[in-house]
Amino acid sequence: MAASQGGGGNSGGGGCGGGGSSGGCGTAGGGGGGAGGGGGGGGGTLVVPIPVPTLFGQPFPNGPPWNPGSLQPQHTVRSLDRALEEAGSSGILSLSGRKLRDFPGSGYDLTDTTQADLSRNRFTEIPSDVWLFAPLETLNLYHNCIKTIPEAIKNLQMLTYLNISRNLLSTLPKYLFDLPLKVLVVSNNKLVSIPEEIGKLKDLMELDISCNEIQVLPQQMGKLHSLRELNIRRNNLHVLPDELGDLPLVKLDFSCNKVTEIPVCYRKLHHLQVIILDNNPLQVPPAQICLKGKVHIFKYLNIQACCRMDKKPDSLDLPSLSKRMPSQPLTDSMEDFYPNKNHGPDSGIGSDNGEKRLSTTEPSDDDTVSLHSQVSESNREQTSRNDSHIIGSKTDSQKDQEVYDFVDPNTEDVAVPEQGNAHIGSFVSFFKGKEKCSEKSRKNEELGDEKRLEKEQLLAEEEDDDLKEVTDLRKIAAQLLQQEQKNRILNHSTSVMRNKPKQTVECEKSVSADEVNSPLSPLTWQPLENQKDQIDEQPWPESHPIIWQSEERRRSKQIRKEYFKYKSMRKSSSGNENDEQDSDNANMSTQSPVSSEEYDRTDGFSHSPFGLKPRSAFSRSSRQEYGAADPGFTMRRKMEHLREEREQIRQLRNNLESRLKVILPDDIGAALMDGVVLCHLANHIRPRSVASIHVPSPAVPKLSMAKCRRNVENFLDACKKLGVSQERLCLPHHILEERGLVKVGVTVQALLELPTTKASQLSVA
């Protein structure tokens, strides 16, 4: 149909003579012949000529629509040529967002290019023409398909800015870190590690390695003494390296990682203005501290550091305040850590307003440059002692053409030469004073360590002396007993020996109350450290001397072992000592141990630890006194008592672990103090016996004492309801103060021994 209409148009053109122009127009117009044919078909033999502009402005419905984008490639080519021409004259090459796969600048001289923007293209590798740009300082390769960085990049020895983010890099080559880079952006790649050679980038000020798969940061990052901004967001980091605490960071972003702890040494980041740590399972500091902001985080880190170094809370390490205000004394306020006003040369780094934080302007005066270099030099010396906070970024400011300037750019340049020398002198004197203070504190710490070691040695010597004294006294008593045995054999007949049991019974009845209650009596109860005046229950007069000596050596070794075991168990068992005593010894004296001076009043034997006297020790009455000593307070009986307590505590641990299927720590008293384990045990015996249990959370890992007491009281109430008798029920302080584990074990044992039928009846009721 269209072809026939076109034919009509052509024939009409031949008949009228005007069709020639119409047909000519159609031929020249590229599709106009079809339009003319349509016109001829509609108008018969008459064809109306249509001007060319009208054809483009008002396309006919039956013809193909005109697409203005058909001319776009010609404009793109012209704009690309124009960009290359401008790059040759200005040194700035901008080819961003052109979907280029190959570099088009083969016919242009671009060797003087200083800035090249090749971002948002489709380069699979860095164009080889770029390696010819010797003076290149800035290279932007953002959003391409680059997989590797060739070694030819070493030709760009003036490159300070490199952005190769959002590409397909899996590793960073070692030769990349031989360049004088100040800004390196390699985010949104597939990096799994950072080479150790990154420590060579002494001038690096900004590093962005976010959105990768990095698991560990190298320790060599602590050598980046000029680093101001570090972005390690969205990686797989579990631990932050301690070396970052020595850097002069202004911004730190480690969000969206797996970090659980901020190192305490990060309290030295006194220039830090922005810290982003969200989306991390942080435990130290706790979540409620992190939500309060930067100041509270640093305060928490300072308190933790003081606790670890056994310092007082009023000796917090606040050197940043003294650096910002050398003429003002230090205070304990953590709010001064980051003042809102500018002080001294720290105009941008020490403020929170975010303005003028990173100034890239070069000092306009030689005195300003010298001041900056002097401050940086002093800071480098302090950094080597791990006690400084870096203010400058480099030692030589003239070498760095784009350093971060810490002098307020709004300050008049005229005032700098007048005050430059004063600033230099004040800072140098301040740092010298700081060195002296650090030396004094170091000496004080050394003296404290020496004193602590001396005290420990004295305590160890005292313990050894006590043990030696016990063994010496036993030897003396052994000699006296041997002498007594010889005298008895010589002076007494066989009939006297037959009546010995009867005399022993009479002597036991004749012990006076004065002897029992006397402060020097051998029956006086005393702690184990002074068990020198206690008697062993072994029948000494009946033993053979040689057998007794071998037995004595064995006992002395056993005493030494039990002595140190007792000291470790004394804290947990001290609350139960009075409860375990026999009723016959309830009224005995509990006075302080007898001093060594009292032993020497009568040649060391008048009140000997075995109740023996120098000459009357061989008489019958002294033997009766010796035989009447209560064996319940001997050292061996005390050791047996401690072994029983340890066995009960072990049984308590086994009961809890077997019933609850958990593993308790070595310090079982601390594990039971909050009452959570005991409440779970009660609910295990009878469900819902404890309605509510206060449990710790990751944000608050330790319960308050009020909540601990509430848990303990709920547990004891549940025990009463379940049928535990009052005699076998422990008291709250036995659990809360960790001093009655034996009583707690009795209560738990009673709870487990309840009949199942009774427990089921109670649950039904």
From Swiss-Prot:
Ranges annotated as biased composition (Polar residues):
518-529, 584-595
Q: Superkingdom, according to UniProt? A: Eukaryota
Recorded coiled-coil stretches: 438-472
Q: Sorted alphabetically, which keywords does the UniProt record give?
A: Coiled coil, Leucine-rich repeat, Repeat
Q: What does this protein do?
A: May play a role in the organization of the cytoskeleton.
Checking PANTHER family in the record gives: LEUCINE-RICH REPEAT AND CALPONIN HOMOLOGY DOMAIN-CONTAINING PROTEIN 2 ISOFORM X1 (PTHR48051:SF14), PTHR48051
Mind telling me what this protein is named? Leucine-rich repeat and calponin homology domain-containing protein 2
Tell me the classification of the organism that encodes this protein: Eukaryota, Metazoa, Chordata, Craniata, Vertebrata
Gene that this sequence comes from: LRCH2
